[in-house]
Curated annotation (Swiss-Prot):
The record marks H18 as: Transition state stabilizer. InterPro entries: Cyt_trans-like, PPAT, Rossmann-like_a/b/a_fold. This is Phosphopantetheine adenylyltransferase. Belongs to the bacterial CoaD family. It comes from Bradyrhizobium sp. (strain ORS 278). Reversibly transfers an adenylyl group from ATP to 4'-phosphopantetheine, yielding dephospho-CoA (dPCoA) and pyrophosphate. GO terms for molecular function: ATP binding; pantetheine-phosphate adenylyltransferase activity. ATP binds at S10, F11, H18, G94, L95, R96, E104, V129, R130, P131, I132, T133, A134, S135.
Length: 164
């Protein structure tokens, strides 16, 4: 049986924190699916297509180097439903701090009630990337700050261009 893991998020933009989670997650599964959430009530900075392209460009080579199959797709339903539809048995969630843990434990409990066969796996963020959030990265970029410490190199120019 192939161990498929789903790593959901908005990825707006892809950050070094996301990359850190993927670097760990590819060793936990045979196939990793990055699921880009489409929330019709939100206006993301990057289009769905741009976020998918970033995911493929940044995460694909990491998965390949680890011998893990990779795909990126979108979803606009419950995350647990997207995981079921993908055939996932694991849902990957990154944790930066205790606040993340409290929130993620609540979600994991709800998801386990709805889909008992899908296990949530918490991946602790490495120390250097713990403070990184996509919303802070967007704010720094909007104010002309240096973002290269927070996002992969291939994301720097597209992110700067959004505020040029």
């Amino acid at each position: 049986m192939q161990r498929i893991a789903l790593y959901p998020g908005s990825f707006d933009p892809v950050t070094n924190g996301h990359l850190d989670v993927v670097r760990q997650a590819v060793h936990l599964c045979d196939k990793l699916i990055v699921a880009v959430g489409v929330h019709h009530g939100k206006k993301p900075l990057f289009s769905t297509e741009e976020r998918l392209a970033m995911a493929h460009e940044v995460f694909g080579p990491v998965a390949s180097a680890a011998g893990c199959a990779f795909d990126a797709s979108t979803y606009d339903n419950l995350t647990v439903t997207a995981a079921q539809q993908a055939g996932a048995i694991l849902m990957i969630r990154g944790l930066r701090d205790g606040t993340d843990l409290d929130y993620e434990m609540q979600l994991a409990g709800m998801n386990q009630t709805m889909a008992p066969s899908i296990q949530t796996v918490f991946v602790p963020a490495s120390v250097p990337v713990r403070p990184i959030t996509a919303s802070l990265v967007r704010q720094i970029a909007a104010m002309g700050g240096e973002i290269s410490h927070f996002v992969p190199p291939s994301v720097v120019a597209p992110l700067k261009a959004k505020f040029a």
